[in-house]
Amino acid sequence: MLIQLKIKLLLLLLLYLLYIFYVFLWKQSEF
């Protein structure tokens, strides 16, 4: 059970990082 929780947290962290990366690229392309 604890392992599943860690996996879910890792997936959320990964999505969060991808989101930040995507926004960063989007702002870079504006200028």
From Swiss-Prot:
This protein's UniProt keywords: Amino-acid biosynthesis, Branched-chain amino acid biosynthesis, Leader peptide, Leucine biosynthesis, Plasmid
GO biological process: L-leucine biosynthetic process
Function in brief: Involved in control of the biosynthesis of leucine.
Protein's UniProt name: leu operon leader peptide
Record organism: Buchnera aphidicola subsp. Rhopalosiphum padi
